[in-house]
Structures are given as C-alpha cells and as structure tokens.
C-alpha cells in the first residue's frame, strides 16, 4: 500500500476540496432538481414510468439473469460491504431495491449497504483505506483520486471479467474514463454529467445566427451579438470552476487529451505552459477584452443562479455550463426554457482538426458515479468469488433495465448506456446524450481529476485569467509548480 499517496489525498479531502467544483456540484444539483420535479409529478407519470420499466426490464428477474453469461458464485456465504452516496429518495430506494433483488437471487450473499453523505464521502473513504477498513465495493468517479486508490492497492482489475462476461453496452467514453493504465477499474452507473453550450434560440433567430460548428464561427456569432446589443456569454465565475469550463474545452479542442495528460504527469516535457494551454488562455483573455463576458464575472455567483438570470433577462445569449442546467432552467420556468433554450456541443478548432487533433473529446464526466471493488484475501491475492458477486451486482442489478428506467423517469438522468435515448423526453437532454454518446473520450473536470492541492491552485488561476491579472504562461507556471509538488509528495 502506498500510504504516503493516501495521506496526500486525505489531507486534501479533509480540506474539503476534492468534491468542490463543477462535476460534483453539478451532479447534486441535477439529481435534487429532478427529484423535486418527480415528487411533484402526477401519478400518471409514475404509471408511465412503471409501464416503460415493465416493457423492457426482463433482465431484473432471476430466470433471465441465470440465462446470461456470468461468472460463477459459490454457495458459500459471502458478506459484501458496500458504500454509496444514495442518501435521499428516489435514488436511495432505487439502489436498495436493486440490492434486495440481487440478494433474493443470490441468497448466500449478504450485502451490507451503507449510504454516506456526498460532502464527506471521499474523506471517509480514504480514512477507511488508511485504517484497513476499505469496503469491498465503493462509489468512485475516475480521475486522480481513483488512480491513487488503484496505485495504493484498493482497486481490483476488472478487465478479465468485463471481457469475458455479460455487461451493459456502455458508451466507449464511459469505459475509457474508468480505465487506468489499460485496466478497467470501475463499473459505471447513473449516467453522465456533461458540458455544453446553452443558447437563446429567440435571440439567435432575431440576429440571424446559425449554430456555430467551429471556433471561428463562434467568434463571428459573438461579434454579431455584440453589435446587436447582447453580451455573448453568461458567466458567473465566483466559484472559479465555471470559468474553467472554457479553459478545459479550448485545451481539449486544440490538443485532445494529450497535452493535459502530459501536464498531469509532468513527464516528457509535459507542462501547463505547453502550446494548447497558452493558446486557450490567450483566447479567453481576448474574449474578455472584446466584451464577450459580463462585467465583473469573478464576483458573480452560479450558486445563486446569477448566470442563469442573465440568460432569463435577455442580457446574454449563450452560456457554457453543465448538463444539470437543463433541470435547473426547467424548474425555474418550464415554458420559457422549452420555448427559448437550445444546446450545442462546443465548436471545433478547425486548424487543429486539419492537423489531426480529434475533435470528439468532450468535457464533463462520462461516469456520473461508478463502483470500484476491493476484494482481496488476507494473503493479498484476489478474492475471486467475492469479486464475481460484486461484478454481477454492479452490472446486472444496479444497471439493469428496471434500475435505469427509474433513473431516467424519476431523476432525469442521461445514461451512459446505449439504447436508452428513446426514453429521454427533453430535447436538449437528447442532444446532450448524443454529444456524449459520440465522444471518443471525456475529459474529466480538472477540479476532479487533479490532486486536491493542485485543484485549488487551478481554480485560483481561473480567477486570475478572467480578471486579466496573469497570462497563460504565468498561470501555467503556477499549475506546474503545484503539480510537481503534489507528485513529489505522493512519491516520497
């Protein structure tokens, strides 16, 4: 076990930084909004959901499960400790139902399910790992923390199970995000949480604009919007991670995943001062100077909905934000949202595309949540029987049709499994689903991927960038120094 690496993570977790940011806050907002909508929905909607489940959910029955190609679980008693973050309904009851169905079909297995609050979850998980009490099955998100769990010996390699036995037809991007060093480290569930551009269709029609597909076209739209009296982008960067969305997408469009991956390792010349990062920074500061963002972006709060308000009152025409904003805007004013708001994927960098840079890397998380497994015998070998049971639970019960239809109907989730798009009713969410279904990979939010100490530096750099306090070279040097320090701590 790499105890030093865990200590570094624990320090960051106790500071409360690992969960801060766009990915985690977005997932919470989307779920709570959807839950509120569902609670207020009529029994007719619930009946429709039930009908849809019954028409497609044969996989949840014991007979159908037994007919599948699944690993063997012995008749010997097994106890699985399981940690999740489903503390409120409908998610809590949906998870518990899946677990109960599994135990009914596998009576020799007892699942001790623990629901933990999201805010302190990572801190509690690392404490459990450090004290030898890591659960057998636990929620993870991918990125830097999962990599450290894997390196520290708390993650089973699921590649052989996944390659040889039945599983849901996950998006390629979801499996890629759950893979570390070529080994599958997590089974996704609960869908995606992605980033996209919201735009006011009414304003676009008024100004005579088409949805831009390249960054050059996007900048042309911005100039025409400015000329018509509109601020192109709504942005509330008081939380800092909101501005990072522009930075992440511009880097991804200019270099795919390559330059970020190199900067993360700080190997073979990798640096946050590399060409893509400086180019993205220069582009953002050019947009700031041209007035593409509201005045005082660093003092506006997304938690208070100030970015959405600038869309509602017609001040701004576009907003780059997380997919959870679909639910937030719908809740605020369903009629206005339906009539006025559309979404499109972040435009491509035509020059980079001509040079062979992939333009289908999206930003967000292709695994809203996932399960990783920690099934080992006392001698350090894999407890294959328990691992088989965990794999079946995660792929055939959590992730069966009944479970997934509840996620769509009751929580407005966009799943990362092929074949469910037909059940999405929100046209904008259909677009989000298509964007991430077609993605070759998903760049996890930097503030979830980076070590905790680097995350804080990165977020502060976004304030400096949008405030024109420092340029791309300068903030890149700050991020490099933080990354090098974090790597030194984890390796010492």
Show where each model-derived region lies.
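Extracytoplasmic/periplasmic substrate-recognition and gating elements
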Residues: 100, 104, 110, 290, ...
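Glycine-centered hinge/linker elements that transmit conformational signals in sensory
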Residues: 224, 266-298
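Extracytoplasmic/periplasmic solute-binding protein
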Residues: 180-189, 195, 219-269
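Extracytoplasmic "Venus flytrap"/periplasmic binding protein-like
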Residues: 98-173, 177-179, 202-213, 309-310, ...
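C-terminal capping/gating helix-and-loop segments adjacent to ligand/active sites or protein-protein/ligand interfaces
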Residues: 409-415, 430-487
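Hinge/lid segment of periplasmic solute-binding proteins
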Residues: 59-72, 141-196, 210, 219, ...
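A structural signal for short loop-to-beta-strand junctions that line the ligand-binding cleft
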Residues: 128, 136, 166-202, 231-234, ...
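Short, solvent-exposed loop/beta-turn-alpha elements that line the ligand-binding surface or hinge
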Residues: 72-73, 157-170, 210, 254-279, ...
């Amino acid at each position: 076990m790499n105890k030093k690496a865990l200590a570094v993570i624990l320090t960051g977790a106790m500071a409360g930084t690992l969960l801060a940011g766009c990915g985690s806050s977005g997932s919470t907002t989307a779920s709570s909004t959807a839950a509120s909508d569902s609670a207020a929905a009529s029994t007719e909607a619930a009946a429709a959901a039930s009908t849809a489940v019954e028409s497609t959910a044969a996989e949840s029955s014991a007979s159908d499960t037994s007919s599948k190609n699944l690993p063997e679980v012995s008749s010997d008693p097994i106890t699985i400790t399981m940690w999740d973050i489903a503390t409120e309904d409908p998610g809590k009851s949906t998870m518990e139902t899946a677990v109960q169905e599994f135990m009914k079909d596998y009576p020799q297995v007892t699942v001790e399910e623990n629901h933990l609050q999201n805010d302190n979850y990572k801190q509690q998980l690392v404490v459990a790992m450090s004290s030898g009490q890591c659960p057998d099955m636990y929620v993870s998100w991918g990125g830097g923390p999962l990599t450290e769990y894997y390196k520290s010996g708390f993650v089973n390699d699921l590649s052989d199970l996944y390659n040889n036995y039945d599983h849901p037809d996950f998006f390629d991007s979801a499996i890629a995000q759950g893979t570390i060093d070529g080994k599958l480290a997590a089974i996704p569930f609960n869908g995606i949480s992605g980033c996209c551009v919201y735009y006011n269709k009414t304003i676009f029609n008024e100004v005579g604009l088409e949805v831009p597909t390249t960054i050059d076209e996007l900048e042309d739209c911005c100039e025409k919007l400015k000329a018509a009296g509109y601020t192109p982008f709504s942005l509330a960067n008081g939380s800092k991670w909101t501005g990072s969305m522009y930075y992440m997408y511009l880097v991804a469009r200019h270099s795919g995943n390559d330059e970020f991956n190199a900067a993360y390792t700080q190997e073979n010349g990798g640096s946050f001062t590399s060409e893509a990062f400086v180019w993205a920074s220069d582009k953002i500061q050019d947009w700031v100077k041209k007035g593409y963002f509201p005045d005082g972006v660093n003092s506006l709060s997304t938690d208070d909905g100030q970015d959405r308000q600038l869309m509602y009152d017609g001040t701004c025409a576009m907003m780059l934000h997380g997919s959870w904003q679909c639910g937030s805007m719908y809740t605020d004013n369903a009629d206005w949202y339906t009539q006025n708001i559309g979404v499109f994927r972040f435009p491509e960098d035509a020059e980079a595309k001509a040079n062979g840079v992939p333009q289908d890397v999206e930003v967000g998380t292709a695994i809203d949540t996932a399960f990783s497994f920690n099934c080992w015998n006392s001698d350090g070998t894999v407890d294959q029987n328990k691992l088989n049971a965990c794999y079946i639970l995660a792929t055939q019960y959590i992730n069966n049709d009944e479970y997934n239809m509840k996620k769509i109907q009751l929580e407005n989730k966009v799943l990362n499994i092929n074949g469910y798009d037909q059940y999405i009713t929100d046209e904008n969410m259909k677009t989000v689903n298509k964007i991430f279904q077609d993605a070759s990979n998903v760049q996890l939010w930097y503030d979830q991927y980076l070590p905790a100490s680097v995350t804080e530096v990165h977020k502060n750099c976004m304030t400096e960038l949008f405030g024109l306090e420092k340029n791309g070279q300068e903030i890149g040097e700050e991020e490099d120094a933080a990354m090098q320090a974090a790597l030194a701590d984890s390796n010492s």
